[in-house]
């Protein structure tokens, strides 16, 4: 006699599809990599990762032990066209595809997967449908929308929003299907974990405190306004602090920022160490005295969650979509313009260490309560089971 396996015990094979497979992919890369690892450890979920490009050994190692299936690219980098990628996805016998990011060739692959197999795909825009993001390089996005992206979103079984603000942007773009709201998660180091060795920039002047920015050097991050605000600070206060702007360059923005720091005559207290990964990144978080993100547009910034996880106080804009940071006292609000940033910096840098440490402790408590990966992965696994027909619609899903 044949035994029927209850749906909740059936394995769901999910393909995570993204153009952001390398460390230069910033917050999308970090969040997708951690989500993939946590989902693969969830009961009844198997994960393969797909994307365009040839990865170096260091990037491949970052995804281990997950299967990483890539296809070589042709043409300009901004589109990530990989002719063999669809074949890799179709060969994997997946129950569903989960696309991360928009406007690039992987979107066309997720659409083709659903058309060819009749199986569902889920889309995580990662803030790419926010008004500011839509207006940036808008002509390229209009072309992509006309050719494949609007149809890709229309045919999606569900869209994933990181927060209520992004869910609103998704609806404003015209998507009428189900939306699940699940935030990014973050790894929280144990409280008794030894601090990493001090980074090089602290050794020459250990008495100088560090305000850290870590992320892409891109116009949307609001860094020119931050430099202007830094210039407005009292020179005596500036001597007690260094502004560390760490990250990978996009579109030559780092050259413009360095030139601006020189023109403003603040280069003595502003450091550009380049991109930081692995142990260097951990050291930057652990040895800074505060973190700042003056961004004009975000989905849900991993960098802020990582700073909180290390117990660091944060200055950020409302556009970071983490209002709970302001509500709990874990973050100080700034607007993305120099006067607001300068005023907030004066208050923040002048306050005593105990107050800043109290803010940081509130941030760590916040991520432990609401942004830990086991909880986030369990919520996403429930969405996968529902889409694959192996479970009921989760509470995270709403319909218009």
What are the functions of these language-model segments?
Residues 313-317:
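Short hydrophobic beta-strand element within catalytic cores of glycosyltransferases
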Residues 116, 142-158:
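Membrane-proximal helix-turn-helix segments that form the acceptor-binding/catalytic region
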Residues 30, 34, 209, 213-232, ...:
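A conserved mid-protein helix/loop that constitutes part of the nucleotide-sugar donor-binding site
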Residues 51-56, 186, 214, 242-256, ...:
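Glycosyltransferase donor-sugar binding loop
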Residues 165, 185:
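Carbohydrate-associated surface elements
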Residues 331-339, 347-353:
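Conserved acidic donor-binding segment of nucleotide-sugar-dependent glycosyltransferases
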Residues 354-369, 379-382:
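A short, well-ordered alpha-helix in the C-terminal region of glycosyltransferases
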Residues 296:
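Aromatic "clamp/platform" in nucleotide-sugar-dependent glycosyltransferases that forms part
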């Amino acid at each position: 006699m044949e035994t029927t396996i209850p749906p909740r015990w059936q394995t769901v094979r999910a393909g995570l599809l993204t153009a952001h497979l390398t460390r230069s992919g910033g917050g999308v890369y970090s969040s997708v990599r951690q989500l993939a690892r946590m989902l693969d450890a969830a009961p009844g979920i198997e994960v393969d990762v797909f994307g365009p490009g040839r990865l170096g050994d260091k990037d491949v190692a970052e995804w281990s032990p997950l299967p990483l299936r890539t296809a070589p690219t042709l043409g300009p980098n901004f589109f990530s066209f990989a002719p063999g990628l669809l074949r890799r996805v179709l060969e994997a016998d997946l129950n569903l595809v989960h696309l991360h990011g928009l406007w690039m060739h992987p979107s066309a692959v997720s659409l083709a997967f659903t058309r060819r197999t009749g199986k569902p795909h889920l889309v995580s825009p990662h803030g790419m449908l926010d008004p500011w993001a839509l207006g940036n390089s808008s002509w390229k996005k209009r072309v992509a929308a006309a050719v494949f992206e609007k149809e890709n979103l229309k045919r999606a079984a569900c869209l994933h929003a990181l927060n209520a603000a992004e869910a609103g942007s998704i609806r404003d773009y015209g998507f009428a299907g189900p939306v699940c709201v699940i935030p990014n998660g973050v790894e929280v180091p144990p409280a008794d974990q030894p601090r990493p060795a001090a980074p090089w920039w602290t050794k020459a002047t250990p008495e100088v405190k560090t305000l850290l920015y870590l992320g892409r050097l891109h116009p949307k991050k609001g860094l020119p306004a931050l430099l202007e605000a830094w210039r407005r600070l009292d020179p005596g206060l500036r001597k007690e602090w260094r502004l560390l702007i760490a990250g990978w360059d996009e579109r030559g923005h780092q050259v413009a920022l360095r030139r601006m720091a020189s023109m403003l005559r603040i280069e003595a207290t502003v450091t550009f160490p380049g991109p930081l990964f692995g142990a260097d990144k951990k050291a930057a978080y652990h040895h800074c005295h505060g973190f700042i993100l003056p961004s004009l547009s975000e989905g849900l910034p991993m960098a802020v969650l990582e700073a909180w996880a290390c117990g660091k106080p944060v200055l950020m804009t409302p556009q970071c979509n983490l209002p709970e940071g302001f509500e709990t006292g874990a973050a100080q609000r700034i607007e993305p313009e120099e006067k607001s940033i300068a005023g907030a910096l004066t208050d923040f840098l002048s306050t005593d260490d105990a107050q800043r440490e109290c803010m940081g402790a509130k941030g760590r408590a916040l991520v432990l309560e609401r942004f830990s990966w086991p909880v986030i992965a369990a919520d996403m696994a429930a969405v996968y089971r529902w889409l694959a027909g192996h479970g009921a619609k989760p509470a995270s899903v709403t319909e218009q």
